[in-house]
Amino acid sequence: MNLNYTKNDIKKVIDNINNAKSKKNKFASLVASHDIPKIRTEIFNKISKIGEVKCAGKLLHNDDTLKNEFNNNKIEYLRDFKFNICPENTISDGYITEKLFDSFKAGCIPIYSGDENIELDLVNKNALLFYRKGKDNSEVLKEVERLNKDDKLFDAFQNQIKINDSMVDYLWDRREKILNRLEELINERLK
């Protein structure tokens, strides 16, 4: 663990994510091992009507390239795709995992199902497509279709800022709190 990184280092990482671009070689991906939230298969079935969805995980497996060509490097694998289906395992306030950020980092557009009130407005909600469980998602599906057919529209959508600058301070603050708490715990143990 590098304790010497700076706020500027965090900013560089966020800038790299915001500037990531899909190669647009393939339509959509879904990398998941299960469908416990009972939404991944639903999204797969709907999106598959628009284009071919490659599934490199255990769920709906139809693609071995993540393992065979990309040595299980998910980000490099996702770079080939325009879209990534990435619902969270559960939808609850403040719950967000790597799924959304992996899509951003690879430059593909996330088709996301999760907390719509992403904490502190750290993420540009216009840079992803929200698929809502149990709701009418026809507009989301139409948008996927439009973006898939129109490269200029896709590029404009993809060029949006994905992670807001407020994330730098948020992550720096979290880092400081964790390090301070670790120091407290260590000092308590040494007494």
Feature names for model-found ranges:
Residues 1-55, 59-87, 93-191:
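Pol beta-like nucleotidyltransferase catalytic core
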